[in-house]
């Protein structure tokens, strides 16, 4: 919880508020509405940045063993898993999809920019973005025209 409070609710939000301070910029968080993503930025009533912040860490054992399968499992569980039952929560890409669908239902012709901000430095490795892009393309395929 400390990671969530500091990274999501303080550090990232402070940065976003300093970057998007024009009078036409609107910033919303989960505190405004539990259905919001971590941060939702509406700019000029047309451009929407849907931001999910992830402060999860890869287990040291996975990194120490250089386990590709363990790393892939971490990526899927942390950034690309759909809730399967009550009490569970969508993760990463599925959270973005939910927000994109909610915005599409409003039917205002938004230009949507989905963003995942992460703190885990091992996600900077080559191939991670390609893996997540492929997952995202598969999950969001029918909604791709929105952004």
Protein language model regions, located:
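Short conserved micro-motifs at the rims of enzyme active sites and ligand-binding pockets
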Residues: 1, 52, 61-64, 125-129
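Interfaces and regulatory segments of ATP-dependent nucleotide/adenylate/phosphodiester-chemistry enzymes
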Residues: 1-21, 134-135, 141-147
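Active-site-proximal structural scaffolding
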Residues: 4, 8, 32-33, 44, ...
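Conserved catalytic cores of phosphodiester-cleaving nucleases, focusing on short active-site segments
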Residues: 15, 39-41, 47-55
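A short acidic/basic microdomain associated with nuclease active sites
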Residues: 16-42
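Flexible loop/turn segments at secondary-structure boundaries
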Residues: 34-37, 57-60, 121-125
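Catalytic cores of nucleic-acid endonucleases
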Residues: 55-115
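Polybasic (Lys/Arg-rich)
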Residues: 117-147
């Amino acid at each position: 919880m400390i990671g969530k409070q500091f990274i999501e609710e303080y550090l990232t939000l402070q940065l976003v508020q300093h970057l998007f301070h024009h009078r036409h910029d609107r910033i919303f968080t989960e505190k405004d509405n539990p259905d919001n993503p971590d941060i939702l930025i509406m700019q000029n009533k047309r451009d929407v940045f849907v931001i999910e912040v992830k402060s999860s860490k890869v287990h040291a054992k996975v990194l120490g063993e250089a386990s590709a399968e363990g790393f892939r499992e971490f990526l899927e569980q942390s950034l690309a898993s759909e809730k399967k039952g009550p009490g569970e929560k969508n993760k990463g890409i599925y959270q973005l999809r939910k927000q994109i669908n909610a915005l599409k239902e409003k039917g205002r012709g938004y230009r949507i920019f989905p963003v995942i901000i992460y703190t885990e430095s091992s996600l900077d490795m080559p191939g991670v973005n390609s893996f997540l892009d492929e997952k995202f393309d598969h999950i969001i395929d029918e909604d791709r025209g929105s952004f």
